[in-house]
């Protein structure tokens, strides 16, 4: 076979639609929580592909599942079912509140399905009913949320910077203030068909929901016959130390969306719900070509079986504390963080006023010393590493972060 021609970071600028601005280096290999670039430089991975690589890179059991299924059948289309999708559905049902699952390819698709389901259920059950004032099709979401990039989900996200250039946007979506129950109560009415919320706002700054807030939303949805949708794209599949974050709060949604870590790096999304609400979607009412394909589901089934173990989930909580302790020491030396927040291995370091707006600069500086991390807006440095990252890798990665922080501090104070 002919050898591929060399590519560089400049190739991206020449050939790829400029929706992203990737780092200057190109990663060519990964193992566990270590990545290597074209020049052979190694990096400790605290980003995890944005909360995707929950078992690190190249986990042997996940790789074996992919290879085994690749030797059988890759794709069939939705005119046929397959064994891996049925097994994965049963795994998710057994592990959660759900009774039915819809599979797709991404978090955005899962949220799109959830919002469509809510409107269809309301149409079927409340349209033109006695006492119903107006159409029951309104959706309540929250400011600074992120639910995907489709026109529907980006409109629900409540961040105009992602949606304002694509007007006219879908109507009937209202945004409340996250963690402000009075704001939500003002918006949720008998015309509301759904409330969609992240248990932790990820892109919005790694901001956990208050327990009282989610319980209040549950009560408001029950009062007004609205579906409560938990977007667990980023928080799901062990990320917070429970299989899904709703389990921390003692409140169950009507619909839950999952993606990212579900495939451990292989694209897959899922919408979980109960039989009552799933019945609103009939044959042909919704679908997606690659949803539930055997390759993705074989991988996801293995990922889920490995993560949904008490020892692993307890390990996520322990690793959270290791991060917190080390970050506190860094902050004692450099005084850059106003707050360190999050759950499990979704952690946000909020920069104080002196370093406001410098999250990207800190992440770029840390990369020079061999750490890959994330931002969650201009003021938050974010970590979402492998759930099985070792204590040694955490300590070394944070030492590299400290070097990057020191570099930025010198610029600020000079």
From Swiss-Prot:
Keyword Zinc: no
Record-linked InterPro entries: Ac/SucOrn_transaminase_bac, AcOrn/SuccOrn_fam, Aminotrans_3, Aminotrans_3_PPA_site, Class-III_PLP-dep_AT, PyrdxlP-dep_Trfase, PyrdxlP-dep_Trfase_major, PyrdxlP-dep_Trfase_small
Role played: Catalyzes the transamination of N(2)-succinylornithine and alpha-ketoglutarate into N(2)-succinylglutamate semialdehyde and glutamate. Can also act as an acetylornithine aminotransferase.
PROSITE patterns: AA_TRANSFER_CLASS_3
EC number: 2.6.1.81
GO molecular function, one term: succinylornithine transaminase activity
Protein name: Succinylornithine transaminase
Reactions performed catalytically: N(2)-succinyl-L-ornithine + 2-oxoglutarate = N-succinyl-L-glutamate 5-semialdehyde + L-glutamate
Cofactor field: pyridoxal 5'-phosphate
Residues bearing PTM N6-(pyridoxal phosphate)lysine: 260
Similarity annotation: Belongs to the class-III pyridoxal-phosphate-dependent aminotransferase family. AstC subfamily.
Pfam families: Aminotran_3 (PF00202)
Keyword line: Aminotransferase, Arginine metabolism, Pyridoxal phosphate, Transferase
Organism encoding this protein: Yersinia pestis
Entry's Gene Ontology BP terms: alpha-amino acid biosynthetic process; arginine catabolic process; arginine catabolic process to glutamate; arginine catabolic process to succinate; ornithine catabolic process
HAMAP family, sorted: ArgD_aminotrans_3 (MF_01107), AstC_aminotrans_3 (MF_01173)
Origin: domain of life: Bacteria
Pathway the protein contributes to: Amino-acid degradation; L-arginine degradation via AST pathway; L-glutamate and succinate from L-arginine: step 3/5
């Amino acid at each position: 076979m002919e050898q591929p021609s060399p590519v560089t970071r400049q190739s991206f600028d020449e050939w790829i639609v400029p929706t992203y601005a990737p780092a200057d280096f190109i990663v060519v290999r990964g193992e566990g929580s270590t990545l290597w670039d074209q020049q052979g430089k190694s990096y400790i991975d605290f980003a995890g592909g944005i909360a995707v690589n929950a078992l690190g890179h190249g986990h042997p059991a996940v790789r074996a599942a992919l290879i085994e299924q690749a030797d059988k059948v890759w794709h069939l289309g939705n005119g046929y079912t397959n064994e891996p999708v049925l097994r994965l559905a049963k795994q998710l049902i057994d592990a959660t509140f759900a009774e039915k699952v819809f599979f797709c390819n991404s978090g955005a698709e899962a949220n799109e399905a959830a919002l469509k389901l809510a409107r269809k259920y309301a149409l079927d059950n409340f349209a033109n009913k006695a006492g119903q004032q107006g159409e029951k099709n309104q959706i309540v979401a929250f400011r600074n949320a992120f639910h995907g990039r489709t026109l529907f989900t980006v409109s629900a996200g409540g961040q105009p910077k992602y949606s304002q250039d694509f007007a006219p946007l879908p109507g009937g979506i209202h945004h409340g203030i996250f963690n402000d129950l009075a704001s939500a109560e003002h918006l949720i009415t008998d015309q509301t068909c759904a409330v969609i919320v992240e248990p932790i706002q990820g892109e919005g700054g790694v901001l956990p929901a208050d327990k009282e807030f989610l319980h209040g939303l549950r009560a408001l949805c029950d009062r007004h016959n609205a579906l409560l949708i938990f977007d667990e794209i980023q928080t799901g599949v062990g990320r917070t130390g429970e299989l899904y974050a709703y389990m921390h709060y003692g409140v169950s949604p009507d619909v839950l969306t999952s993606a990212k870590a579900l495939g451990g790096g292989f694209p897959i999304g899922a919408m979980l719900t109960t039989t009552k609400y799933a019945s609103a979607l009939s044959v042909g009412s919704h679908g997606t070509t690659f949803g539930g394909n055997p390759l993705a589901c074989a991988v996801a089934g293995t990922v889920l079986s490995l993560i949904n173990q008490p020892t692993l989930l307890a390990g996520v909580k322990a690793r959270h504390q290791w991060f917190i302790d080390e970050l506190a020491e860094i902050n004692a030396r450099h005084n850059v963080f106003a707050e360190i927040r999050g759950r499990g291995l979704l952690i946000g370091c909020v920069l104080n006023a002196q370093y406001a707006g410098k999250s990207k600069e800190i992440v770029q500086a840390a990369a020079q010393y061999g750490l890959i991390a994330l931002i969650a807006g201009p003021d938050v440095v974010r970590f979402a590493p492998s759930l099985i990252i070792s204590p040694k890798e955490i300590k070394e990665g944070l030492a590299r972060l400290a070097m990057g922080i020191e570099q930025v501090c010198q610029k600020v104070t000079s």
